[in-house]
Design a protein with these regions (language model features):
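N-terminal "domain-start" segment that seeds a small globular fold
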Residues: 1-10
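Short hydrophobic/charged patches on amphipathic alpha-helices used for structural packing
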Residues: 8, 58-61
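Short active-site neighborhood of thiol/selenol oxidoreductases, capturing the structured segment around
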Residues: 13-25
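Thiol-based oxidoreductase modules, predominantly thioredoxin-like and allied folds used
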Residues: 22, 45-59
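The canonical Cys-X-X-Cys-His
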Residues: 27-30, 72
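Typically the conserved alpha-helix immediately C-terminal to a functionally engaged Cys/Sec
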Residues: 29-43
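Structural micro-motif
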Residues: 64-73
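Non-catalytic, surface beta->alpha helical segment in thiol-disulfide oxidoreductase systems
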Residues: 73-107
């Protein structure tokens, strides 16, 4: 059974650093990005990672205006600071993770 998708209100209420990963299990771009995403996230254990199966009629993806997969949204205390779309570059991913991680200590 699939976990229920969080609401936009629940996502906006999250504290700390969060990466939302929108995609689909059958998406080739999503599959190709998984090793890069997983290896970079392993270096930032303090960052919450939420994978969201996206598609037609999925409200959370629409509320973030997700159009291509994968889309990674880097958030701090419910506020989007950066996003990566489709071609996930390891350097850009690391930069986004460092951005939200750096905000952990200082607030």
């Amino acid at each position: 059974m699939q976990n229920p998708e969080p609401t936009r209100e629940e996502v906006n209420a999250l504290t700390g650093a969060t990466v939302l990963e929108f995609g689909a299990s059958w998406c080739g771009y999503c599959k190709a990005a998984q090793s890069t995403i997983n290896s970079e996230l392993a270096n930032f254990p303090n960052i919450r990672h939420i994978k969201i199966e996206d598609g037609k009629g999925r409200r959370l993806g629409r509320s973030f205006q997700v159009k291509l997969w994968p889309t990674l949204i880097f958030m701090k205390d419910g506020v989007e600071l950066k996003r990566l779309v489709r071609e996930i570059d390891a350097g850009e991913l690391k930069s986004g993770l460092a951005l939200i991680s750096a905000h952990q200590a200082g607030g």
